[in-house]
Amino acid sequence: MDLLKPNPANSCPLTPLTFLERAATVYGESTSIIYNTTAYTWSQTNRRCLQLASSITSLGINRGHVVSVVAPNIPAMYELHFAVPMTGAVLNTINTRLDARMISVLLRHSETKLVFVDKLFLPLLVQATTLFPTGNQPPTLVLITDDEVSSSTTVNFHHTYEDLVKKGDPDFTWVRPESEWDPMTLNYTSGTTSSPKGVVHSHRSIFIITVDSLIDWSVQKHPVYLWTLPMFHSNGWSFSWGMAAVGGTNICMRKFDVSLVCDLVGRYNVTHMCGAPVVLNMLSSSPNAKLLKNPVQFLTGGAPPPAAVLLRTESLGFVVSHGYGLTEAAGVVVSCAWKPNWNDLTALERATLKARQGVRTIGITEVDVVDTHSGERVKRDGLTLGEVVLKGGCVMLGYLKDPETTSQCIRSDGWLYTGDVGVIHSDGYLEIKDRLKDVIISGGENVCCVEVESVVYMNAAVVEAAVVARPDEFWGETPCAFVSVKGGVINGRDDQEKEIVEFCRERLPHYMVPKTVVVMEELPKNSTGKIQKVMLREIAKSMGSLSVNAM
C-alpha cells in the first residue's frame, strides 16, 4: 500500500468549470438560459463562454488577475462565472447596492484589472473610478449592453460585452488551474471602507460546495431555476455552476419584482429558487399570489421565516428549506434536514423546527458549538450557548491581504470560527441564537454595525452612537441606531431623529441606513464605560416590527 501514491492521472485539479463542457456534450440542445426574449442552449453557452474567455485573455488578463463584475442577474453575469476563471483569472462579483465610494475601495483593494459593468450601473462605476487617488490606474471598463434597458452614456467604450463574445475564438483552450488550490473567486463580505474583507475561494472549494449543494437540496436533472437570489451573493450560493452540472435552465431577471416572479414561475414551470426570508414574505403577501400548478422548492437562509409567512408560502405550494452559510464557506453548509414524521406536526411546530439551522451538509467535515472561553464542546441541551465552528473542504483560503484577520478566523486548532452564537439541541440540530460579530441581516444584505456607527458619529450633534438589529417581520432585521446628542434630548426629538436618518442617507447605501433612531440622554454602559448593546438589543426587540402591516 505504501507504494501507491498520487499521480497525474488521479490528482487532476478539481474545478467546477468542467461542468460546462460536459453540459454542452450531454445537454447541448437543452435550454440553458432564458432572459426576456433571449434564449440559449448549453452548447451555445459553452461556445459563448469560450469566445469571451479568449477575448478577455487578449486584453492582457492572466492567471491570478482579478476581474470584477457589476451587474444584476442577466445572462452576462451568469456567463462570466465561467468565462473569467477560464482565463485563469479570479472572479469578483460586486454587490450592485453598494455606493461609489465603497466600490472604489473594493476595486483598489482587489487590484482589479478589468470590470464588466451593466449599463444601468455605469454612472456608479464612472463615479467610483474618479475616486481613485492620483497615480492609481483605474481598471478597464467593458460595457454590458441590454436592449431592455434605456440609459444614455457619454463614455466612449473601446469594448462591449457582445463585441468580445463575437471576436473571441470558439476553439479557445481554456486555462485549467495548475492546482485545485488556485484562487477562483473573490467575494467581499461585511467590513469597513478602511478594512474590506475579501474572501478568496479555490477551485477545489467551489467544486465541493457546488456538488454539496446539489446533493443536499436533492436537485435532479433538468431543473428550472429562477434567479431571485443575486448572483453577487456568494456566487448565488454556487448554483451558478450547479445548473450546468445538472443541465438546468436558468431563468434570469434583472430586478426582483413580485408580479414578474409569479408570471415566470407559471410560464416556465419553475422548480427551484432561493432567497432571503423577505422574498417569501413578498411572494406570499402579493395580490398576484395564487396556488402553484406544481411544487416549487425554495431555499432560504439568514433569519428563519416567521411561522405566519411559512404557513402562507407553503399553502401556495412552495416547499421551504432553511439553511445556514457564510461567505467564508462559499455557501450553505448547514441545512435543516427534514424528517418525514415532522409533516404531521402543526404549522407552528413545523415552523419552530424549521427555524433551526440544522445539521452539516455532506461537504462539511464537522460543525460544532464551543464554549467561547474554554473551547470545549457545549452541552447538547438546546440551551448552552457557544460559538459555531466548522471545518471542511469548502472553507476559504483566507482574506485577501489580511493574514491577521484570517488567523483570527481560521485558527491553529483547525477550525473556522464563524463569530455566530448558537446551541446544539439533543437531536444534534444546530440553532443560531446571536452573532458575536456585529452584523445585521436586512433583506438578505449584511449590514456592518461598525460602519453605520462610524457614519452616525460623523454627525456633529452626536455624542454617542450604537447600532443594533431591530427584528422585522418583513426584512428580518433593520438597523436601529441609539444616540445621545449634544444638549441632551429636546422637545423636538422627532426632528433630531429624522435629521440623523437623512444624514445617513447621504452617506450610506440605502439598505444600511438606520430605519429607527432613538435619542437618549445617555446610552447604557457597564463599569468599564463600554456601551451595553445587550440592553439596547432588548429595547429594540421590545419595539416590535416596523413592518407589522406586512404580515
Which residues are covered by each model-predicted region?
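Conserved pre-ATP/AMP-binding loop-to-beta segment of ANL
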Residues: S11, G28-T31, V142-L143, E148, ...
